Structures are given as C-alpha cells and as structure tokens.
C-alpha cells in the first residue's frame, strides 16, 4: 500500500542543479561520454563528477562501456559512460482547450506510447478520461511507473494531482502548460544570459519567461481570447463554427475565407503582432516562441503578424511559432514527465524501490 501523501508536487522547471541531475542531463542530450566530458560540460570538479557518476550507476541510470575503451596513451583507460535502459517509465499529459495528449517516455525523453483523450464536462470528468487513457496504455506494458506529470492550461491542477496519486500511487507533478513549454526551451540550452519568452494563446493569453533562475509565468490582461474573436465574427455576420470549443471551433481548418473574413483576421494578426512586440520589449527576450491555437488557427495571418513584430524588436531576436497542437502537447508532456528525474534522478530510483516496484 502506498504511503505517499495525496497531493501533487510543484514542478521545478529550471536547469538541473544537483550534480547527479546535471550529469544525467548532459548525457540525455548525447550518447557516450567519459568523466572528463562531464567535468567540462557541467563545470563541476572531478571528485564531484566521480561521486555523481557512482550514484547514477548505482541507480541504474547509466553504465560503463569498457568494451568501447580506446587506447589513449599512458595512464588509466578512460571508460565511456552511456545511459542505461531503465525498467520503468515516466508518464506525461498535456491538457489544453482542444483536448488532452498522453505520452509514456523513457529516461532519455523518447516517446514510447502516445494517445489522445477527450476533455470532460468538468475537471473530475477530465481526470477520469486521463486515468482511463493511462490504464489502456499500461495494459500493453508490464513496466512500473516512476512518476506522472500533467501540464494544464486550466486552474484545476489540485484535484488532478490528488486523483492521479490516489489511483496510481506514484508521485504526481502538476504544473502550468505555458511554464512547461518555457522549461522545454530552457533545457535545450546549457546557459543563457538572455530571457526566453513563451507566449501562449489558448483560452487566454499567458506568458512564461525562462532564464538562469528558472521559469516564471504571468497572465496577461488582453482582449485576444476566443470570446473576443467570436464577438468580432458575430458582429461581422460571419457565423462561427460550432464543432469544437475555443479557436479551432470558431475557425475550423475548412472554413472558407471571404474577403470580409480575411480583413478581420488581418486586423487581428496586426493586434497580435503589437502584443508580441510589446511583450518582447518588456522582457528583453532574445528567443520568443509563440504557441497555442490562438496563433496557429490562422496560418495565413503569419505574414501580417511578422510585419508588425519585426520592425519593433531587436534584429537579433529569434521568433518562431510552434506549428501544431501535437508538437506543443508532446513538448509540454515530456517536460513535466521528466521534471522529477531532472531534479533528483537518484531519488526517482529510490522511490521505486521504496514502493517495491523494483
């Protein structure tokens, strides 16, 4: 019987700080490494790296490959290290206005299984859809669950965490979806002095800023949500779609674009561009990622948006759009699924042992 508290963890969403986590993070991004590589990559001392490697080997997260030793002159041979296949998995889910995505990941962050699940009429109903999806995927895999992470756009994270912990007896991490996207960007870099800005437009506009201190999120008071678009469409006598909720319900992919609709959407793209430029200036970001259906619902508006943004931000600023919902959801799910592993990897192994899963 699990002795876990029925509550969810708050994700760290920062670069790894523990020596074991820093070494593992470096190895997750490559293949083979020797201890000297880890010293150079992490800036840690040789003794600290040696202790971290010993702990990671003991936890079954990495192993030595003496068969790959190459002669390199006098002295002790430098034995390559490699991430080991682990007998457990990490579960991540992303819940947006358009639906849920569920993924099973290994310790490298590679996707093992993936599916989608519908949103319920309320938070408890959505939780049951997620739980059913996890059970379906687990029925095909006789592998223990190290932890479960959920990234959500709605403020119902407390109930989700409690329900998932109750059902599966594994540690649960629940966090903000926009923050998880910012953390995903942060974890692809070794160091940065300039902020990374994520602007996510779904049911409302939310921004997350990532830097060396971690990730902070900020709701933005704006009139750019789906309700505003619905109002403009109605006032222009353009009937909004009724198939799905949110932006994609208002403008399904097959929506014919009349001159009146295109004019309305171009004005909206201009307003979006002004907002993106202002937020980029306010945060001093040099990397800006635009995410969510509020941006992708109108790909024909990208040029108008860019024409508004580019003259008003530093030319060195890199701006891109996450092109589709699947890419966004997978990035968020992976990041929150691996948050505990990248905070304290040895503790993940110890937790499985304590729960008699290994």
What are these regions (language model features)?
Residues 1-64, 74-77, 82-106, 111, ...:
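ATP-binding/phosphotransfer module of carbohydrate and carboxylate kinases, centering on a glycine-rich
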Residues 64-66, 174-178, 323:
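Short loop/edge segments at beta-strand edges and connector loops
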Residues 67-71:
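Short, solvent-exposed loop/turn elements at beta->coil junctions and helix N-caps
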Residues 80, 90-94, 147-149, 195-200, ...:
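Short glycine-aspartate micro-motif
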Residues 113-143:
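N-terminal phosphate-binding loop and adjacent alpha-helix
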Residues 114-116, 122-126, 162-263, 328, ...:
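Glycine/GP-enriched mid-protein hinge/lid loop-to-helix segment characteristic of carbohydrate kinases
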Residues 129-140, 163, 188-189, 271, ...:
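Amphipathic alpha-helical regulatory segments at dimerization interfaces
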Residues 138-162, 282, 286-294:
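Short beta-strand-loop/turn "lid" adjacent to the catalytic site in phosphate-handling enzymes
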């Amino acid at each position: 019987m699990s002795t876990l508290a029925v509550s969810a963890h708050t994700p760290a969403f920062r670069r790894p700080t523990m020596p074991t986590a820093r070494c593992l993070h470096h190895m997750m991004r490559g293949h083979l490494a020797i201890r000297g590589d880890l010293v150079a990559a992490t800036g840690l001392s040789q003794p600290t790296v040696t202790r971290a490697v010993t702990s990671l080997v003991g936890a079954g997260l990495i192993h030595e490959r003496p068969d790959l030793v190459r002669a390199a002159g006098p002295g002790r041979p430098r034995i390559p290290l490699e991430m080991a296949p682990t007998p457990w998995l990490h579960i991540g889910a992303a819940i947006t206005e358009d639906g849920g995505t569920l993924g099973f990941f290994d310790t490298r962050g590679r996707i093992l299984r993936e599916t989608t699940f519908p949103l319920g009429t309320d938070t408890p109903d959505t939780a049951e859809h997620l739980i059913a999806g996890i059970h379906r995927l687990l029925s095909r895999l006789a592998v223990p669950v190290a932890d479960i992470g959920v990234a959500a756009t709605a403020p119902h994270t407390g109930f989700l965490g409690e329900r998932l912990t109750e059902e599966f007896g594994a540690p649960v991490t629940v966090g903000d979806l926009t923050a998880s996207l910012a953390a995903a960007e942060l974890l692809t870099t070794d160091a940065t002095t300039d902020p990374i800005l994520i602007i996510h437009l779904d049911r409302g506009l939310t921004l997350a800023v990532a830097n060396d201190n971690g990730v902070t999120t900020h709701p933005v008071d704006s009139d750019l949500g789906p309700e505003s678009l619905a109002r403009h469409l109605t006032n222009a006598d353009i009937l909004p779609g009724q198939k799905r909720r949110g932006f994609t319900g208002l403008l399904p992919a097959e929506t014919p674009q009349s001159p009146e609709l295109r004019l309305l959407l171009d004005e909206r793209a201009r307003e979006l561009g002004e907002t993106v430029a202002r937020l980029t200036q306010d945060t001093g970001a040099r990397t800006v990622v635009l995410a969510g259906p509020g941006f992708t619902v109108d790909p024909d508006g990208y040029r108008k948006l860019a024409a508004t943004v580019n003259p008003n931000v530093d030319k060195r600023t890199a701006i891109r759009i996450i092109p589709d919902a699947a890419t966004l959801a997978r990035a968020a799910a992976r990041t929150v699924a691996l948050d505990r592993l990248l905070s304290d990897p040895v503790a993940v192994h110890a937790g499985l042992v304590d729960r008699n899963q290994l």
